[in-house]
Amino acid sequence: MHKIYPLIKSTNFPYIERNSLKTIQVNLGYKCNQRCVHCHVNAGPNRKEMMNKKTIDNVIDFCVNNEIQAVDLTGGAPEINKHFKYIIQKLFKKNIHIINRCNLTILEEEGMDELLDFFPKYKVELIASLPCYSQSNVDAQRGKGVFDKSIRILKKLNNKGYGESKSLLLNLVYN
């Protein structure tokens, strides 16, 4: 900002100052159970790049040492990372708020249904992506049946208290 400021000073552009870092977003990997045509990281089932445990430990240390208040987990589908529960458990013990960006259908994949009980236990805030409110549009972008699966999972999350209590936050993003 310091080098560019003289160039924008005459434009009445407001000076930007940064405050302390409070939230970081961490991409746990590019592997995903979906192949969304609009995915900005080109995630998909064939991607192999996943964050390893050593890097996750470095992220946790960074958060503790820099008084980070929230960690926003993303991917691909972050739940696919084999250290997904580990990072949540460690951050929770350090009293760091956890946000998980979820495509919803991952929670119907084999072995993932246990996350429906895991998320509330660790007060994970969920940001669920749904590219549209119509079945035809969602299925066109994400594949046939994705809309119905997403609605099924949303109902299950509601039954676990998400969207029903202030302590279990569920946000839908229209992307």
Protein language model features and the residues they cover:
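Conserved alpha-helical substructure of the radical SAM core
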Residues: 2-75, 79-97, 102
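Short helix-terminating capping/connector loops at secondary-structure junctions
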Residues: 19, 66, 162-169
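Core AdoMet radical
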Residues: 23, 43-51, 68-81, 92-111, ...
